[in-house]
Regions:
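Phosphate- and other anionic-substrate recognition elements at nucleic-acid/protein interfaces
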Residues: 1-168
Length: 168
């Protein structure tokens, strides 16, 4: 993912009912470090308030399921969106002191990693969502084909047991 010039990087450790956000300027200065509820209006307010500082990049640790709302709100607010994969997150966490795993620490690591090592980020774009939907539909087709084959083979087996001369 290419990030270009980003003025504010928001690391968002997503959760089921609440998230923790850590926003940093390009200089590394933390300008926001608070929990956020899973609420569209409050997410939008934070994103738009931080846009006063310039271009905003929102980086999440989980782009699907519980991370879908912050991503949708960030896109709608005009923010860039990125994703820090789990393996990159774990490796980045090893670079920071301490071993405790807290939402605040994770949000800080996400933001700082996105700011200092943008090559670790993955794009969260709509094409990936379409591709995921197509993979799911393709999986359904595979399941249906396997079920049809299984049914035909079972029917053939039962008919052969009843009337063996059908095998010829």
């Amino acid at each position: 993912m290419t990030t270009g010039t980003i003025d504010v990087t928001i690391g968002l450790d997503v959760g089921k009912t609440a998230h923790h956000a850590c926003a940093m300027l390009a200089t590394g200065e933390i300008i926001y470090d608070k929990p956020l509820p899973q609420d569209e209006d409050q997410l939008r307010k934070v994103f738009t308030d931080l846009q006063a500082c310039g271009t905003v990049l929102v980086v999440v640790d989980q782009p699907n399921t519980i991370g879908a709302l912050p991503i949708a709100v960030a896109r709608d607010a005009g923010c860039l969106v990125g994703y820090l994969p789990g393996l990159a997150m774990r490796k980045a966490a090893d670079l920071y002191p301490g071993r405790s795993k807290t939402d605040r620490r994770d949000a800080f690591i996400i933001a700082d990693t996105a700011r200092t090592m943008p090559h670790t980020l993955r794009a969260v774009d709509r094409d990936n969502e379409v591709l995921s939907a197509l993979k799911m539909l393709s999986g359904f087709d595979d399941d249906i084909a396997k079920d049809a084959t299984r049914t035909i083979n079972r029917l053939r087996s039962v008919l052969t047991q009843i009337y063996p001369s059908l095998e010829r």
